[in-house]
Each structure stands twice: as structure tokens, then as C-alpha cells.
């Protein structure tokens, strides 16, 4: 029977076998090509839409942190703040006490106006400090803290501190470290431009949370924000996000990568902000995204099997 199919003597039978074979080949090629083109089309459309959403989110984040930077700059330029950062605490005791009162009133005013500023700390290069809502845990100078040193090294640029764990400051209201992101900036003498201290602001994450939660990436995707150190700044409740490798989204200002997590394929799309050094990341369950293509592949396989059975039976 097999020999008869492979080497038929009847011309009509030969034509049937040939036509069935060609039909099978055309079906497989067209189905594979169609699926590939459709899958690439979905990937490109997903990439373009996600990039647009992420760039809008990053622009909004830039505006939020630019506002923080402007407010820090304005606070640092107040005459009483400038004088407080330069005062000699030991030899100018009376002046120091009065300046502390004035600066503390300023900090309270700022915290009332900007309710998202959970904590504001002013630290002089001499080690003295004032805050609206925190106190020093250990009697070690805050100038030795990493966040202070980072601000000095940034030379006047706003720095986002990735974590406040281990910081020598504790808030009276006892905010969780998951509730805010710390920003620090060097304050310079208005006359000499020399650094005279640092201002730290703990920004409530709710403003960022609202932006990220508004990101809609279809039924199979979600978004999150990652800082320059690879720490997740904010993400929705999701077991996948904490299995992401930060190095996957560090190649260039934007891009995409396919990765495998817990046996599933994910399409990862990312975009980076030069101003904040933050990265917006979109993650899609690629298997669910192309379920329609998978069904089409299954149907095409069954069609091929039916054709082969028909050819063999003929």
C-alpha cells in the first residue's frame, strides 16, 4: 500500500497525490506566513502603543520631580535658610536659635502647602539639621549619610534616593519606607556658589501610584517604575514583577526584550527618562496575547492531517 502511494502507476492517482501534496504545502506555508505576519503586527502595534503610554507617564513624572526640585531650590534660597546653613552653632548661639525658629516655621508651611511632602530635612555642611517630621536616631552627623554624599556629588542636580533603609532618620509619624521616595539636592551659597548644605524631601508615592495605575496595557499586561539602581519604585500587586531582572531593561533609552518567567513567555517594553533616571516598564503575557494565533496554528495542523489522511486513502 505504501509503495503504491509513493510510486503510483496510475496517472490519475499521481495527479491526485501531487495536488494533495501541493495543497498541503500551500496550506502550511500560507498559514505559517500569515501567523508570523500577524504575530509581528501585534508585537509592533503593542510596542508603539506601550511606548506612547510610557513616554506620557515619564513626562508626568518629570514634571512631578521638576516641581520638587524647583521647590527645594526656592526653599534653599530663602535668606533665613541660607543663614541657618552658614551659621556657626557654637559661636553664634543666639542667631542659631532664632534662625532655627524661622526655618522650622518655613518647613511647617511647606508641609501644609504640599501635603505630598511627608518629610523635609535641612542639613548644613557643619552637621546641624532641622526637620518638620523626623529626628536623628543616632548621634552621628547626617553629613556622613549616603544620601547626603550623593547630593554633594550630584553638584546641584536633584537625586532620587533608591531606599531609606538604614537611614539615620526616623519620622515621628512612622511612615513605611514603601510609602515614599526620597529626593535630595545640594544647596549652594547664593554669593559664592559653594555648597553649604543639603535638603531632603520624602515624596508620597501616591502621586506616582496614580500614574502607574492609570496605565492600561490590555488584558494581559501591567506596568511598573524602576529606578536607576534597579529597585522597583512602584508596581501593582503582581508576582511576576519581582522576578524581573533589572538588567533586562538597561540597554539604551528604550527597547523591548522577550523573557521567560515561571515557564511563560513575556514581552517586556521599556522607556527611560534622562531627567529622573527612572524607567517605565510594560510587561505582557505573550502566550495570552497571541492565543488567537495559537488556535490558528492548531487548526492548520488539523487541516494538514486531514489532507494527509485523504491523500493516503485515495
Residue ranges of predicted features:
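Extracytoplasmic/periplasmic ligand-binding sensor regions of membrane-associated signaling proteins
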Residues: 112-114, 126-202
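Membrane-proximal, non-catalytic sensory/regulatory domains of signal-transducing membrane proteins
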Residues: 152-188, 220-222, 243-276
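Extreme N-terminal signal-anchor transmembrane helix of membrane signaling/transducer proteins, especially
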Residues: 2-44, 48, 305, 309
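Cytoplasm-proximal transmembrane signaling helix
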Residues: 279-314
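Signal-transducing alpha-helical linker
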Residues: 33, 49, 80, 301, ...
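Extracytoplasmic/periplasmic sensory segments of membrane signal-transduction proteins
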Residues: 48-156
Amino acid at each position: 500500500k505504501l509503495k503504491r502511494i509513493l510510486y503510483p502507476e496510475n496517472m490519475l492517482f499521481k495527479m491526485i497525490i501531487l495536488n494533495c501534496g501541493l495543497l498541503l504545502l500551500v496550506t502550511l506555508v500560507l498559514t505559517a506566513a500569515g501567523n508570523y505576519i500577524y504575530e509581528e503586527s501585534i508585537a509592533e502595534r503593542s510596542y508603539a502603543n506601550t511606548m506612547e503610554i510610557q513616554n506620557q507617564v515619564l513626562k508626568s513624572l518629570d514634571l512631578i520631580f521638576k516641581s520638587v526640585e524647583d521647590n527645594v531650590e526656592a526653599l534653599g534660597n530663602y535668606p533665613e535658610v541660607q543663614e541657618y546653613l552658614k551659621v556657626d552653632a557654637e559661636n553664634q548661639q543666639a542667631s542659631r536659635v532664632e534662625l532655627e525658629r524661622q526655618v522650622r516655621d518655613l518647613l511647617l508651611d511647606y508641609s501644609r502647602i504640599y501635603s505630598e511632602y511627608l518629610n523635609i530635612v535641612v542639613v548644613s555642611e557643619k552637621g546641624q539639621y532641622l526637620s518638620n517630621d523626623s529626628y536623628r536616631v543616632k548621634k552621628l552627623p547626617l553629613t556622613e549619610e549616603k544620601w547626603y554624599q550623593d547630593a554633594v556629588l550630584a553638584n546641584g542636580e536633584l537625586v532620587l534616593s533608591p531606599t531609606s533603609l538604614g537611614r539615620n532618620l526616623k519620622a515621628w509619624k512612622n511612615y513605611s519606607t514603601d510609602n515614599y521616595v526620597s529626593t535630595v539636592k545640594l544647596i549652594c551659597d547664593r554669593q559664592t556658589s559653594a555648597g553649604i548644605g543639603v535638603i531632603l524631601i520624602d515624596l508620597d508615592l501616591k502621586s506616582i501610584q496614580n500614574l502607574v495605575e492609570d496605565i492600561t496595557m490590555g488584558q494581559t499586561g501591567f506596568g511598573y517604575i524602576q529606578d536607576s539602581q534597579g529597585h522597583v519604585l512602584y508596581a501593582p500587586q503582581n508576582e511576576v514583577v519581582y522576578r524581573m531582572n533589572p538588567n533586562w531593561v538597561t540597554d539604551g533609552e528604550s527597547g523591548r526584550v522577550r523573557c521567560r518567567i515561571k515557564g511563560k513567555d513575556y514581552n517586556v517594553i521599556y522607556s527611560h527618562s534622562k531627567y529622573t533616571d527612572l524607567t517605565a516598564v510594560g510587561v505582557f503575557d505573550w502566550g495570552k496575547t497571541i492565543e488567537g494565533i495559537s488556535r490558528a496554528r492548531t487548526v492548520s495542523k488539523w487541516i494538514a492531517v486531514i489532507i494527509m489522511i485523504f491523500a493516503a486513502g485515495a
